[in-house]
Regions:
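Amphipathic alpha-helical repeat scaffolds of TPR domains
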Residues: 17-30, 53-75, 100-119, 144-159, ...
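Hydrophobic, well-structured mid-protein blocks that either form specific transmembrane helices
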Residues: 81-133
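Bacterial Sec-dependent N-terminal signal peptides
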Residues: 1-20
């Protein structure tokens, strides 16, 4: 009887895990294909439902935040703060389940960048500084993560030449990101693997 119960419990755990994996794979594909704010909002809500159902998995909270972040970068300025704040709330939940994770720090970097872009001149010292701190933390945790150099390049690309930025400074970082993507292997197929095309596109923009 005990053995039978153990088999049934193991089977139930496997089925739940398999269901989680399938739901995540479906939503990651939807996130990759999303083009509009509405599509990103829908996939963010779907990831959040998975996260709240599972309770112990950080990745659905992370992806819900990423969907909000991508939506935030394209949003009107008057909406950017609220969207970035929602992403930060989700990332706090992810971080409570998975501390010291480079991907979470990179997402926090992007959320702070969205806040900063609302008014770069007045927000650089606060949100710009926070974004830089999160990027440095991600690099310390995972120096071979290609998204580190993509986001570092993005920061320099958007910084005026007179302040140490510009295309010439950004291009080597985008090139390094592309090169690292050639050997980068995520932990599994649910882990973050976005950014190679973005980095390659930015190399072209720097020419």
């Amino acid at each position: 009887m005990v053995c039978m119960m153990m088999v049934l419990l193991a089977g139930g755990t496997y089925a739940q895990s398999d269901k989680f994996k399938q739901a995540m794979e479906t939503n990651i594909s939807s996130l990759d294909a999303a083009k509009s704010a509405a599509e990103l909002q829908n996939v963010a809500a779907s990831f959040e439902r998975i996260a709240n159902a599972e309770k112990t998995q950080w990745l659905p909270f992370y992806y819900a935040a990423i969907a909000n972040i991508w939506k935030g970068f394209a949003a009107p300025k008057e909406e950017m703060d609220d969207i970035a704040t929602q992403a930060e709330i989700l990332l706090t939940k992810a971080e409570a389940l998975e501390a010291n994770n480079a991907e979470i720090f990179l997402a926090k970097n992007m959320a702070s960048t969205i806040h900063m872009l609302v008014d770069p001149q007045t927000r650089w010292q606060t949100y710009g500084s926070k974004a830089a701190q999160d990027l440095a933390a991600a690099k310390k945790l995972d120096a071979n993560n290609p998204r580190v150099y993509f986001l570092e390049g993005q920061s320099l690309f958007g910084t005026p030449v007179q302040f140490g930025g510009g295309k010439d400074k950004a291009k080597p970082l985008f090139e390094k990101s592309v090169a690292l993507f050639d050997t980068y292997k995520p932990v599994n197929n649910l882990y973050p693997n976005w950014g190679k095309k973005n980095a390659a596109d930015m190399v072209e923009q720097c020419k």
